[in-house]
Design a protein with these regions (language model features):
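Basic, flexible Lys/Arg- and Gly-enriched helix-loop patches that mediate nucleic-acid binding at interfaces
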Residues: 1-131
Length: 131
């Protein structure tokens, strides 16, 4: 127990927050051009050194973890740890089995970068597709 001026303090070594990130916020701790996910938190949490574990694009919504625990964040994010991640996407245009095959081989990006192989499960395919 820790007390200051007779008042008990609650002390936690680490804090984890599960945030349903809305569109329009950057997955960053600070940015001079726009609002960040930390702006969505109460003031007391904003002062705890929290940072996003991963990244969702500004126009994307979904679950984002925030923490001040670097060790576990590293375990979740490091490509060497091979932690599976799952995303739900809605795209304009038809998804095909060729798209699934390209994901399975590893996508080739501009600049020569090749992504790790991934599974693409097509839920619906049409003018708008979901995977």
């Amino acid at each position: 127990m820790i007390a200051v001026n007779g008042e008990l303090l609650n002390w936690r070594r680490y804090t984890w927050v599960m945030l349903n990130k809305p569109a329009g916020y950057l997955s960053a701790t600070e940015d001079g051009r726009g609002a960040t996910v930390l702006d969505l938190l109460p003031q007391d949490l904003q002062r705890q050194g929290l940072f996003p574990v991963g990244r969702l694009d500004k126009d994307t919504e979904g679950l984002l973890l925030l923490t001040n625990e670097g060790g576990l964040a590293h375990e979740l994010l490091s490509p060497k740890k091979h932690v599976d991640k799952e995303y739900y996407v809605r795209v304009t245009g038809r998804l095909t089995e060729a798209d699934s095959a390209a994901f399975a081989e590893g996508l080739h990006l501009d600049g020569g970068l090749i992504c790790q192989p991934a599974e693409l499960r097509i839920l619906t395919s049409g003018e708008e597709s979901e995977a």
